[in-house]
C-alpha cells in the first residue's frame, strides 16, 4: 500500500474554528493521546495566524476533555512565571499586552491567555503556564539574572561580587532575540565575553557548593528553581555565541542544541514536581519538538528538545507537528537594523516539493487533516521524507521525527509582524 492510500483511509479531518466553537472534530484523538503525559504541538514557522487558532482549539480540548494541566510554551522561563501569576488572577485583563510586547506575539495568543485566565477562575484543577526557553528569546541575560542576583543579595552576600561582575557586563547585551544579541555581540570585548562566561559558571558552581545550606533554609523547590534560572543564563550565553558563529559562517555542528537542552530540562524540571501528576502540552517550532536530529544538507544543526524528551520519558512523549499546504509563511533572516534582529518576509508558498509530507497529504484530496504515524504499516511505500521549515524543505524520516502531523490548507502571517 502507498502512503497516499493509507492517508485517505486513516486521516482525521477537522475544521479551523472560531476560538469559542466546539472541538468535536478532535475527539477521535482521545484514543491516540491516551495516557501520554507530554504532548508537543508544533509549527513549521513562527507567527502563523492559523497555527495559533488551531492550537487554541487543541489546547481547550486537551484541558477540558483530556485532563491536561500545564501549557508549556517556547517562552522565557522567568517571563513565563509572570504570565503564570497573571492567569491565576493577579493584575488586570489588559496587562497581557504588556507581557507580550517584547516579540511578535499575535492577538490569537492573547486570546489563548485570556481564555486560560477565565478558565482558572472557576476550575478546580488550575492550569499552569510554563515558559521553557532561555530568557527573552535568547536576547538578554537580565530576566534570569535579576532574579538570581536578588537571591544572592539575600542568601549569599559573600559571593554577591561574582554576579555583580557578570551583571555589569551582561547589561550591555539586552536585546529581544538570539540573532539580535549575536549581531550585537561586538559590543563586548573578547575579554568581557570570556569574563562573563567565566562568572556565569562561577555563579552556578557557587549555588551548588552552598546547596545544603540553601535547601535547608529555602527548601528544595526554591533552590532548584534558582539553579534553573542560573542554567538559563549559561545556556543563553552559549547560544548567543553559537548563533554568532553561524551568522559569520563558522558554526559548529550541533551548536544550536544548547537552547533545546534547556527547553527539555525545563519540561523535565516541571515533571519532577511531587505535588501532582502533571500532564503537559508543549508548544514550540516543529524543529524543536521533533524526535530526530535537525539536518541541513547533511550538516547537523541541532539535537532537538523532542529527541531529548523522547530519550528521557519514552512513549510518554508525543510529537505532533503542524504544517500547511498553501498561502504564505514567515521567512526569517538575521538583520541588524530591524526591530528584533531579523527580517520577516511574507513568503508566498508555491506547490509543495515532491517527497514532502505537504505534497503527499494534499495529493490524497484531503485538507485540514491530522495523520497519526505511530501505527504506520512497516511495508508502506512512498512515505514522505521531508517537511517544510519556514520557507525551505528539510529532510526527515517523518514517521520517526513525529508521531503525527496536522496539515491545514492555507496559512497566513500574523498582522502583528507588520504593525
Swiss-Prot record:
GO terms for biological process: response to antibiotic. Keywords: Antibiotic resistance, Hydrolase, Plasmid, Serine esterase. It comes from the Bacteria. Coiled coil: none annotated. GO terms for molecular function: carboxylic ester hydrolase activity. Pfam families: Erythro_esteras. Transmembrane segments: none annotated. InterPro entries: Emycin_Estase (IPR007815), Emycin_Estase_proteobac (IPR016273), Hydrolase/PRTase-associated (IPR052036). The keyword Hydrolase applies. Its EC number is 3.1.1.-. Signal peptide: none annotated. CDD domains: Ere-like (cd14728). This enzyme confers resistance to erythromycin through inactivation by hydrolyzing the lactone ring of the antibiotic. Erythromycin esterase type I and type II share no significant homology except for the region from 279 to 309. This is Erythromycin esterase type II. It comes from Escherichia coli.
